[in-house]
Amino acid sequence: MMGKIAYGLAGLLAFVVCLGVANGASQLEFPVWDRHYTGTIAGKAVNVGITRINGDLHGSYCYEPCNQRKMRLILSGSLQDKRLLLEERAQTLSGQWDAEISPSEIKGVWTSADKKRHFPIALRYNKPKGDPDIDLVLVAEVNDDYDPSKAIDCNNVPVISAIKLYRDGKLIQTLNTASIGTCSIFTPQWRDVNFDGYPDLSIPQELPAGPNIPEQTWLYDPSTQRYVDAPASYQEITSPEPDAEYKQIVSYWRGGCCSHGVDIYRWKGKEVELIDSGSSYRQPVLSKGKMYTCYVIPSYHDGRIFYLQKRKNGHLTPPFTDVEGCEPFELTTNIRTVIQPEKPGMEPESIEIKWQGNKSSPGEFCPLVPFVEGDKISPRLVTNKDIPDICISRNEFKAMSK
């Protein structure tokens, strides 16, 4: 993703880092990149991701076809000039890599943990479309919380104060920032966030309770060939994910232990606007005569927000039969049944709890709950016989209705 790595530049930076720290400098600099490779190990197709932070490397890979069920082997090691040395682990050490890396490929030898088997490694760098051919160097602050003589870990993480952009070994721009990871540093990412055909640059700022990760983003201005701050309306979005197909920005968020959702934004001129939002709710469910509430978070795909249930030929689909992870029903906030709208742009149907008089106990008002039962909605009046003290008096009902 970073284009051609200037090895001479990296060597010079390593010298500057050592010299600066030795002389008590308050900053150090190191190159970073994230790369995706495909190719073969022992003739078998693999998919590889590697991140470089100065001379340290980490990443993972899997044998094709990769999917969620396939285990990814964990990679860690170092880059010494053009020599790449990695250990791979699947819980325990499973192999070692010794290879040469160039701007376009990795070639070398894989050796088993017992050193009895040796196979060729042949990987090609999948250069992203529109790659800006810019090398990135991070400027890190050396202070009481970071000791550069020790490995970066949860107790030793530097604050990144700037990103330097180089092309062909020449500094073209410096972007000031304030980024600090929890147990490692964040690496910048190239993404076209405003869908103008030019890659923009982003870096996370910190790691709060996920997924609310704030990012700092710079947009590429082709008229000046410089990177400029994205507008505040974009910077305020946490964990933004550009959807290039629909030209939208998607943000999954968390408002607490029991509040999650997804927002959709779209560019309007030089600003972004919120165009849709979906939040979590508690779905009431009847299953085998028992009452439950199931926590549901809407999802995003195909350019729109999707809810769990939709109507088809008068029935709900998919039928709600799995109550694993659901809780026994109790009256809490945000209980409702939500039905997916038939067409994009339409509002979802939201069926709330209503309070209704209990004919079996005059003067008592109980919740009429829109339970989903299999493939249909089964409203049920939940009384004190079901759950003690769930109903309210007439006076309480009048006060609530005002």
Task: Label the predicted regions.
Residues 26-27, 31-33, 56, 82-157, ...:
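Acidic, small-residue rich beta-repeat scaffolds with periodic aromatic anchors
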Residues 210-217, 258-263:
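Structural motif
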